Amino acid sequence: MAKRKAVRKKVVKKNIARGICHISASFNNTLVTITDEMGNMIAWSSAGSLGFKGSKKSTPFAAQAAVEDAVAKAQVHGVKELGIKVQGPGSGRETATKAVGGIEGIRVTFMKDVTPLPHNGCRAPKRRRV
């Protein structure tokens, strides 16, 4: 019986000049998604997908590496301007936003914190006693 070859999708190069970098920094991981202005995904990366495991995923260095990887993938599609939307309380927030600004060939147009805050909604989980 013949072996089947793994079918891989061919990456179609898009020509997008502006995008939005969505950084979701949780306590356990940092997710970076780059979309166009309509919200269609161009590239993504995360600390876990780059090989960081366990508690190393939540470090600022892992967040910086995830941002650099996602922006490098987006630059293939012609992205030159990025807006930044940050969500979550994670330790990689500040490092990730600085990493976007430090990449050569990328101009940051805006920065916005889009962390959802309840106006006294659901009851919060009980505090941990460590």
Curated annotation (Swiss-Prot):
The lineage of its organism: Bacteria, Pseudomonadati, Campylobacterota, Epsilonproteobacteria, Campylobacterales. Belongs to the universal ribosomal protein uS11 family. Keywords: Ribonucleoprotein, Ribosomal protein, RNA-binding, rRNA-binding. It comes from the Bacteria. The keyword RNA-binding applies. Part of the 30S ribosomal subunit. Interacts with proteins S7 and S18. Binds to IF-3. It holds the Pfam family Ribosomal_S11. Transmembrane segments: none annotated. This is Small ribosomal subunit protein uS11. GO terms for biological process: translation. One of its GO terms (molecular function) is structural constituent of ribosome. InterPro entries: Ribosomal_uS11, Ribosomal_uS11_bac-type, Ribosomal_uS11_sf. HAMAP family: Ribosomal_uS11 (MF_01310). The keyword Lipid biosynthesis does not apply. Located on the platform of the 30S subunit, it bridges several disparate RNA helices of the 16S rRNA. Forms part of the Shine-Dalgarno cleft in the 70S ribosome. The gene is rpsK. One of its GO terms (cellular component) is ribonucleoprotein complex. SUPFAM superfamilies: Translational machinery components.
